[in-house]
Structures are given as C-alpha cells and as structure tokens.
C-alpha cells in the first residue's frame, strides 16, 4: 500500500492540474473503505482557485483480477455522471478530480453525517418508519431525476472504455454477472434438495431479464448497503458506485424491503415502515412510471425483484469465484469467453458441479436447522438469508393472486429451514 503522504500528494497534483494554483492537502484522516480501497479525508489549504474546504481521496489498488479492477472505471464514470446531474437528482458527492492510471478519485466531503446503518441501529419503531420514508423519497428523486439520462451515462462509459483494450467487454460482463447470480442461486437451492415452485422459478427467470433491460430503468449505485448511505442535513447521500449503472428500479426498492441483503438487519420486518418507504418512493416516480400507482402491478414487480435478491444472496454463499464457477457452468462460461476473459477448461474427470465445493459448500450452509450445529460464520450467513426470505414471505403474503400464497409458503419454508 502506498504511504499516506504519497496518495495525498497525488491527489494534490490532480487538483492543481485541474483547478490551477498550488493545491495543498493537510490534516489527513484515514476513513473506512470498502475492500482494499484506501480512503482519506484531507483539509484543503485556503486557495482562491478551489472553494472546497475539505475533500475525500480514494485510491483503489490494482488487484490483478481484471474483473475486480474494472470496478474502478465504472465508479469513475458513475461519479462523472452523478456530478453532471442537477442537485435535486444527484445521489451523492461530486467528482472533483481523478487519475485512472494511478486509480485515484477525489470527491467532495459530505462531512460527519451518520450512516443509515447507525441510524437504523438507534431507531425505535416510529423513527424506523420515518427513516425509511425519507429513504424512499431520496431513492425516488434519484430514479425520477435520471430516468431519461441513460444515453448520457452510456456516452461517458464509452468514452472511458474505448481507448482501453477489452474494457467495454469487461463492463458488459460485470453487468451480466448480476443476472447470472439469480440463476445460480436457483441452482444452489435445488442442489440443497429444496423444491422450487413454478411460480418462483418463472418470476426468477423473468426478473433475470428485466434487471438490465426492463422498461423502468434509472441510475442506481445498486449497492445500497446501509454503510454506503450517509445522512447529512436530513438528506440521504449514496456512496460506492463500483456497481452503478442503469438497472430496473424495483430492484432498489426490493433491496430495502428485503432489509438489505448481505447486511444483518437491526429490526425485524416492519410492515408499516415498508409501506411508508414504498409509498414515498411511488410519490416521487409516479409521473415517470404511472403503472406504479396500480397496486397489483407494484406488488408483482417488487415481489419478483425480492425473489431476484433472495436468489442472488444464495448465490453469494458459494466459496468458488465466478471464474471458477464458469469452468463448469456453460452459460457463465459463454459470457466470459465473449468478454475475452480466459476460463480454464473444466476438469471433466473430477469436476464438481457449479456451486458444489466440498463440506463448506453453499448447499451445506442451506441444510435444515435440525442438522446443526453451525459454525459462527454459518450462523451469521443463515441469519442474513433468513431475514431476506422472511421479508419475501411477508411481502408476498399481501398479494391477492393465489400465486403469492405459493411464493409465501416457499419463502416461509426456507426461512424456517434457516433458523
């Protein structure tokens, strides 16, 4: 890891080249970052050429994995795009400078606001409802404000990738992986011996296609983990754009309804808070997508997206990397090959099926609770999955069509299995 003065020196040089004068960054503070990223806050020495008093500097060291490293370009483009938006639609900080060769981003400092995770942990039931209502409004404003701007985002992405060999293909592959995870999750559940009703299977298949090509698309960071959402001055700001792009907006809604998959919820499913969240979101987007005002349509779309998140969460259980899974998964392998990513030929003599990797496999984690004991890690993972399936069951139970009853029973049975 580069030492702190070097990272900050690079950032100061970037700002100097862009804004003029001689920029100086002092009082450097290390912040929490995702993965191996280095994140710092620094105070800007007073300078007439640059009005910001402090900045956040993020460096994402190259890992050597081309799929992982492609996230930096996506994040840079997403910040470029977000910065170009009007303040009412802008989801988070503005981009102040960047250097793709040194993998450094400089963004505006939001200050010392609290994360959504902290807010939810401290909330009583009434406050919980109010927080989700505000979150629904913030998401809706972002979705409504960016629904017609997809071409602008794509232009920025094309500019960033066209001079970099195979970069565009890697970005397309990263998008495809999101829908592959839904399919892989279905396979993992079946491999664990759980029957999947036709209603669930059809919804999973449909939502797989809709994620990237649905008619209700808008810009989203996609990673809405509560640690990546900051509240300042009663407004929510979304951080971490490594998976940002144009996706079906109901996936964002479902992520919150599901109580943030891959994040242990502070509270049980709260029907009142969920309704307040969805209603606030609908009020912001109904002029853009009038169909969300029809309860049956809204119920169907959110339920399907919940199924998508549940299956994706199950897929993440697998200890194999996606490259390793691609060795034995023909559909995944085809997309890797199309993107120019090398995948080793499968070991036909002893290869395990995708998703099966020995005693610690995803299938094993999904075993019935009567077949315990479970390790501490298994218990945490099972709790997170249980929360997701409980949320799916609770939301599906409100649907009027008989198919929702089938979905409810499936989700409830899986939640019980994971106790």
Descriptions of predicted regions:
Residues 227-259:
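Catalytic activation segment of kinase domains across protein kinase-like and atypical kinase folds
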Residues 113-156, 204, 210:
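Conserved kinase catalytic-core helix
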Residues 1-8, 155-208, 285, 385-406:
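Active-site catalytic-loop/activation-segment of kinase and kinase-like phosphoryl-transfer enzymes
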Residues 308-419:
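ATP/Mg2+ or Mg2+-diphosphate-binding catalytic cores
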């Amino acid at each position: 890891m580069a030492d702190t003065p070097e990272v900050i020196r690079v950032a100061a040089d970037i700002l100097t080249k862009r804004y003029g004068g001689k920029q100086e960054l002092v009082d450097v503070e290390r912040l929490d970052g995702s993965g191996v990223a280095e994140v710092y806050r620094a105070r800007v020495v007073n300078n007439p050429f640059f009005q910001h008093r402090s900045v956040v500097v993020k460096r994402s060291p190259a890992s050597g994995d081309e799929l992982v490293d492609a996230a930096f370009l996506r994040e840079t483009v997403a910040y470029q795009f977000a910065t170009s938006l009007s303040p009412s639609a802008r989801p988070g900080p503005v981009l102040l400078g960047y250097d793709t060769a040194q993998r450094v981003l400089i963004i505006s400092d939001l200050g010392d606001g609290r994360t959504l995770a902290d807010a939810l942990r401290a909330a009583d039931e009434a406050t919980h409802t109010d927080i989700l209502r505000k979150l629904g409004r913030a998401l809706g404003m972002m979705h409504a404000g960016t629904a017609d701007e997809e071409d602008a985002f794509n232009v920025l992405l094309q500019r960033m990738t066209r001079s970099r060999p195979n970069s565009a293909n890697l970005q397309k592959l990263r998008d495809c992986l999101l829908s592959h995870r839904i399919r892989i999750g279905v396979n993992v559940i079946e491999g664990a011996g759980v029957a999947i009703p036709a209603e669930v299977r059809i919804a999973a298949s449909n939502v797989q296609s809709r994620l990237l090509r649905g008619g209700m698309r808008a810009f989203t960071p996609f990673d809405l983990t509560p640690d990546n959402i900051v509240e300042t001055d009663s407004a929510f700001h979304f951080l971490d754009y490594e998976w940002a792009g144009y996706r079906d907006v109901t996936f964002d809604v479902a992520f919150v309804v599901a109580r943030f998959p891959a994040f242990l919820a502070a509270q049980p499913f709260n029907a009142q808070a969920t309704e307040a969240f969805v209603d606030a979101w609908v009020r912001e987007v109904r002029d853009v997508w009038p169909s969300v005002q029809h309860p049956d349509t809204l119920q169907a779309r959110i339920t399907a997206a919940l199924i998508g998140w549940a299956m994706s969460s199950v897929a993440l259980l697998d200890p194999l990397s996606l490259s390793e899974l691609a060795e034995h998964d023909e559909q995944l392998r085809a997309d890797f090959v199309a993107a120019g990513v090398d995948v080793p030929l499968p070991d036909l003599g002893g290869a395990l099926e995708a998703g099966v990797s020995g005693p610690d496999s995803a299938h094993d984690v999904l075993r019935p609770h009567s077949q315990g004991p479970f390790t501490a890690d298994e218990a945490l993972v099972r709790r997170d999955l249980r929360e997701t399936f409980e949320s799916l069951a609770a939301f599906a139970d409100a649907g009027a069509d008989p198919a929702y009853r089938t979905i409810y029973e499936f989700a409830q049975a899986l939640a019980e299995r994971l106790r």
